[in-house]
Amino acid sequence: MKSLILIAMLLMLDCANSLNCRGPYTSYNNKCIWVNRLDKMHHKKTYSEASTTCLITFPMGTLARRSLIDNEKDMKFISKFGMGQSLWIRDDKKPEVGKCAYTDGKTFGFSPCNATYGFVCID
């Protein structure tokens, strides 16, 4: 009986620690992440549109913050699934007026917010 209780408790702990991501999000590196490179030019989004898309897709979704993805493992994931394209993210520092942050999975940069790119969301 004690062993059954122990097994049940271990299973509950395992389930509590596993990350269940919803919709287009993929569980990676203890995060739910969605890389949307939007191949077709007319499907790419401005920074504001990308931010809204993350929020509308799931209420807890936001553009990925640079401080959360600025590590080798996450950047390789973004580079692989983003195929080297520019993708909108949020930066922890306030960029100059009219500029927004992006990454291609290798570097970070700033571009006019009305440029159209894919995006990286985290839920």
UniProtKB/Swiss-Prot annotation:
GO terms for molecular function: carbohydrate binding. Residues 21-122 form the C-type lectin domain. It comes from the Viruses. Keywords: Lectin. The keyword RNA-binding does not apply. This is Putative C-type lectin protein FPV003/FPV258. It comes from Fowlpox virus (strain NVSL) (FPV). The lineage of its organism: Viruses, Varidnaviria, Bamfordvirae, Nucleocytoviricota, Pokkesviricetes.
